[in-house]
A protein has these predicted regions:
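Sec-dependent bacterial lipoprotein signal peptides
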Residues: 1-20
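Small side chains
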Residues: 11-16, 43, 145, 151, ...
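A structural "domain/chain start" motif
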Residues: 20-86, 95, 101, 167, ...
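Surface-exposed short loop/turn segments
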Residues: 21-25, 97-161, 185
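Generic short beta-strand segments
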Residues: 48-52, 108-115, 121, 166-173
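Short secondary-structure boundary motifs at beta->alpha junctions and helix caps
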Residues: 60-70, 134-148, 154-204
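Generic structural signal for residues in well-ordered beta-strands
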Residues: 89-91
């Protein structure tokens, strides 16, 4: 009998531990058209291994703990965005390898922040049988997320064309169910929209900057070397 109880205890503990395990959360980031003028310049995105493999663990209230492969998401999204501005985009692990590009882009690991709000739902659940009476008050969970993204853009001779930190607005997503997949999808959505927000800011700030326009004009006027 004791051995049976021990097996049950171990099984329950295993379920409890597995339920607390972080959930992998790919963001499936895709950049929409930015409606910017494409140049004839070439670009290289520097993605060191530490950035490419960056997978921060984020604990989000009311949702759980998530491992977000933000390095992979950043590379995908930045490549798509830069391809709308530059004739070609290469990706290298070290800046010294970017020897033939007009423009070099370096990024820091994005800072992800998110929190959930589920107090109303939990309060209504506590009412027991009266839950469905009070459900008319829309007991949805709301998740808020934002991203801060720092980056620098330099010319082929090292001249700075852009440097700064871009802060997304706070993006929100609500879900009326407590299903684990719905919670994860809500967190994925606010992270993805926030990352896209910051990349759009970076690209639009770059293409509007006088430094970039002047540099692009000089590179376009430079005679082609035989």
């Amino acid at each position: 009998m004791g051995s049976i109880l021990r097996i049950v205890q171990v099984g329950v503990l295993g379920v409890a531990v597995s339920s607390c395990a972080p959930t992998p959360l790919p963001l499936h980031t895709t950049m929409d058209p930015l409606k910017v003028r494409k140049t004839s310049l070439t670009a290289t995105l520097v993605m060191p291994e530490s950035l490419k493999n960056a997978t921060p663990r984020k604990e989000v209230s009311c949702a759980g703990t998530f491992d977000v492969p933000i390095g992979v998401e950043l590379e995908t999204a930045m490549t798509q965005a830069l391809s709308q501005v530059f004739e070609s985009v290469d990706v290298v692990e070290e800046k010294r390898l970017a020897t033939h590009s007009d423009v070099i882009i370096e990024m820091a690991i994005p800072d992800l922040q998110a929190e959930g709000h589920c107090t109303l739902r939990r309060t209504l659940y506590a009412t027991g049988p009266l839950y469905f009476v009070f459900a008319m008050f829309d007991p949805s969970d709301t998740y808020e997320g934002r991203v801060d993204l720092s980056g620098t853009v330099t010319g082929s001779a090292g001249q700075q064309l852009l440097a700064g930190t871009f802060n997304s607005k706070t993006h929100t997503k609500s879900t009326i169910t407590t299903d684990r997949l719905n919670r994860a999808f809500a967190v994925e959505t606010v992270f993805r929209e926030s990352l896209i927000d910051t990349i759009q800011q970076l690209i639009r700030t770059l293409v509007k900057s006088p430094e970039f326009h002047e540099y692009a004009d000089r590179r376009n006027a430079k005679p082609v070397q035989p």
